[in-house]
Amino acid sequence: MSDSAANNILSIYRRHADAFASQRSRALFEKSWLDKFITVMGGQGSIVDIGCGNGQPIAGYFIQQGFQLTGIDGSPAMLARARHSFPAQRWLEQDMRELVLNETFDGLIAWDSFFHLTQQDQQKMFPIFDRLSHPGSALMFTSGTDNGIAMGQFEDEPLFHASLAPDEYRALLSAHGFAVVEMMMEDPHCAGHTIWLAQKTG
């Protein structure tokens, strides 16, 4: 069940883009963490939003702060909404697991997207984070609290989530040149999200 649900993630977001857009909160409860991310970046530069969805509210917040943004998503319908809202930015239809970008960014964010990958695919993302970053780049992503799989539901379909253990995330970050700046389990001020903020050191 979990393997088929993991393989169905892109299909769900492609078929239910309108439902996601209507249900996604725009309250920006993430703001304090987005501001921390900006601070680690140095307050300026380019950002890649991996799993950007329709661009609201996270990509939109960065754009309003003056950042040049590249949004990556596997749902054409969501990207169409993002392009309509922010035509001056770059929006690319790609699977994050096979991300092809021949450049580095000052900030990399995978908020509520990376955790839809299987544990094996999450492990394989760290060389991609490494390749897309340079010394000083900020990286932020959300995860679960411990090693395991959790099933949610969206539009009456099973919605796959997975997580590695915190020690494994720390080891993967370190192995690919990132130092953890801050990590918080189930932040009560951020809708219970577990958040990792790191910086490329070498």
Task: Name these PLM-found stretches.
Residues 1-42:
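Conserved class I S-adenosyl-L-methionine
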Residues 48, 54-98:
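Class I SAM-dependent methyltransferase SAM/SAH-binding core
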Residues 109-110:
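A conserved beta-strand element that flanks and buttresses the S-adenosyl-L-methionine
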Residues 123-135:
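A short glycine-rich, Lys/Arg-flanked "PGG" loop and its adjoining helix->strand segment in the class I
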Residues 136-143:
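Conserved beta-strand signature within the Rossmann-like core of class I S-adenosyl-L-methionine
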Residues 144-149:
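Short "lid" loop at the C-terminus of a central beta-strand within the Rossmann-like core
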Residues 151-167:
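Acceptor-substrate binding/catalytic loop of class I
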Residues 185-202:
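Core SAM-dependent methyltransferase catalytic element
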